[in-house]
A protein has these predicted regions:
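Low-complexity, intrinsically disordered extramembrane tails and loops of integral membrane proteins
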Residues: 1-19
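Short juxtamembrane and helix-loop transition motifs at transmembrane-helix boundaries
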Residues: 11-16, 102-106, 191-195
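Coil-to-alpha-helix initiation sites in intrinsically disordered, low-complexity, charged segments
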Residues: 16-27, 96, 192-193
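Selected alpha-helical membrane-embedding segments in polytopic membrane proteins
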Residues: 21, 34-156
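A generic alpha-helix surface/boundary motif
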Residues: 30, 122-126, 209-211
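Hydrophobic alpha-helical transmembrane segments and adjacent short intramembrane/lumenal linkers
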Residues: 139-255
């Protein structure tokens, strides 16, 4: 009787102190299960987000001078000429300048657009898991998204290194600068739909998805199998939407050239 009472009143072991941001970054790469459990207990957002943004702007600073915006504007001008051959050279020059200006502005704002994307990802994931009976808060979901984004940070660092060594790069071919997905096996202009579809199956994207599954299972208190079903279903929907847009763009270009 006394042994039972002693056992019921035995003190529980205290939880280890939460890891700092750099320990968590290393942890999601080498020990993701325990690290995401730690993130779920005490999520953090500001420091990892700032680190990703700083690295993103370093990459942008190195990449922007190497972007061949002329190639983008020339391709657009060819499409415009095919549809409106009566356009004057002055009009085409104005379109070229606007295209290049927009590309440069979008490039510098790219890392900031990432914040919007992370917020959307966190909101959609949290909603999906809550609808499926899971738990969690928005802060847990956002922290999970940020730490799961580490493989993409590594990807952009690799892309930057390759771009710096290569010189000028056509921005429309950025997805195949690093041969980490099978899209490089097809020509983007000849098979735009297949190119868009294959670009989704990237090694770094799959790595990120695996981390998302582990992290979402941790904060939502669901099984990894259920987390995988939810995350991969949402990814499949995103692929369908992206491929549909590629198909519409291809159909539009086909109409212009006929």
């Amino acid at each position: 009787m006394s042994e039972t009472a002693d056992a019921s009143h035995s003190p529980t072991l205290p939880l280890p102190p939460p890891k700092n941001t750099f320990q968590r970054i290393a942890g999601v790469l080498f020990a993701p299960a325990s690290t995401f459990e730690d993130i779920a207990r005490k999520p953090d957002v500001l420091v990892p987000m700032l680190l990703i943004l700083v690295i993103g702007y370093i990459n942008t600073f190195l990449m922007m001078p190497r972007m061949d915006w002329n190639a983008v504007s020339e391709a657009q001008i060819e499409a415009i000429k095919a549809k409106n051959p009566q356009m004057t050279d002055a009009d085409l020059e104005r379109v070229s300048r606007m295209t290049q200006a927009f590309g440069k502005v979008a490039g510098w704002f790219g890392p900031l657009f990432g914040i919007v994307w992370w917020l959307i990802m966190a909101g959609v994931l949290l909603l999906a898991f809550r609808l499926m009976g899971g738990q969690g808060t928005f802060k847990q979901a956002l922290s999970t998204v940020l730490y799961s984004w580490i493989p993409m940070v590594i990807y952009y660092i690799v892309v930057t290194i390759v771009a710096v060594g290569r010189g000028k790069i056509d921005p429309t071919h950025m997805v195949t600068v690093v041969k980490s997905n099978p899209a490089f096996l097809v020509d983007m202009k000849e098979q735009p739909i297949l190119f868009s579809l294959l670009s989704n199956f990237d090694v770094f994207t799959i790595w990120m998805l695996v981390l998302l599954i582990i992290g979402c299972a941790a904060f939502s208190k669901t099984s990894r199998a259920k987390a995988a079903a939810i995350v991969l279903s949402l990814w499949a929907v995103m692929i369908l939407i992206k491929t549909a847009f590629a198909a519409m763009a291809a159909a539009k270009m086909k109409v212009k050239t006929t």
